[in-house]
Amino acid sequence: MIALAVISAAVIAVERWADDSRYVTVEICVEYESALAHADQLGYDSMQSYLSALKESGVVSVGVSQVALADFLLERGVSAFHGDELLDHDALTSVQHPALRSLLDRGLVNRDSLYLLPGDPELALLLESASLKEADRPTAVRLHTSGTSSVIEILSDGPVAEGFQFGFCKHQVQTVADAGLKVVPRLMNPKSASIDAIDAVLAHLDDVEECTTVIFSGTEAFGSPHNLRYTAGRLLEMGIAPGMVEFSVQAGDRQLAQLVDYEVIRIHSIVPSEYSVLSAREMLDRLFRAVSERNVRLLYLRPHLIEPQLEDGNALDFINSLRYRLESNGYVMGPAQAYPRSSPRLLEPLVPVMALGAVALFVLIVLYVYPMPALPQVGLAFVASLAVVGIAYLDKLLARLLLSLGVAVMVPAVAVLVSVVRVSGLSTRRAGHPLISALRGWLLAVFVAVAGGLVVAGILSDRSFFSKIVQFLGVKASHT
């Protein structure tokens, strides 16, 4: 049975190798705001020419954030004033704007409100729609008119209105697309996270061509905490994979990953505060290892922060070096994709075989410690198998983790027994030269260790582990 378990694991390993050989596309993504700052650092006269240079260096996409209220108003040529600013200004110099003057004369200017001018019904409607995404209690939006002039009042507590989101800047999206680069939207979770708010945000993705990946900003996964299932359904329906930034915990991200069947993109991003303490070589090594060791497939860069750390060349050269290193190791630059399949096709039917192999290994160790007749051996194996089936009935993932942990702990013990103790019940050998005997024992121990590792890898061969959403710490346990 142990031999069958090892053979089953080898079969799954072949399938995994076939999948891994197709999972080699890496996407280098640059933050738009950082790109803007870097273009200024290098003295480019237009963003278009800078983005073209980025593409030549190996960049595939640009991360674009949702438009906040300040940028939205600037784009529309609208000025914003807090109520306390207006009252203080009017105390020194009389405000002449007719609609504001009317409110001031009637004592209707609220210190906590935000006033926008010029106002118009269309803008008021957009702001009212945006307010529905904020908190459970929508922020009141009022249009005040006096003659031909008007002003919009947003009643809010503190900076609530400044948190309004208005989709994506069409100019930014178009500029990126014209350069032949892909847009990766960055989504902020609406404060209310209601279904209507989620739909409103996702509707803005219609402005982004070939959107296949989104990255979440802030401390929460999109749709958290109550509508993650709905969000997952919409993302699957739209063919969009959520990005999971490693080492960054966002509320609800693991649950969302599970709901989309772990069809996620692993992302590595050097946080802004880390750039200043890393050399160019350290950054290059870190980014490459993220891809080669941890299945990261999207590298999120901020070139304006890379630039000061370079002794030679510029950040465009750095990105080109990163691309060269990746391509030299068999990777291909392009849009990132989730792992090809949820799991190898033969995983489900072969997991029980590997589980029985783990049970047989357990019985073998027990027999070494406490020899027993055949009938009790069968009873022990039956009870152990029944325990595995019971746990699997309650939670298949937990059963696989426990089986893997058991194998990871038992295999080193067996390796020691067959190579050092040389107990006849676990290995048979002929007398010979001590060096030859030692070499045989060592080779047998290596075989046992490799076989055990193969079985553990086989049991854990699915996308949840490749994406690092679910992690197995059995190797550490086996060394404690």
Q: What do the PLM-derived regions correspond to, one by one?
A:
Residues 2-10, 352-480:
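Alpha-helical transmembrane segments of integral membrane proteins
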Residues 3-24:
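Membrane-interface motif at the C-terminal end of an N-terminal transmembrane signal
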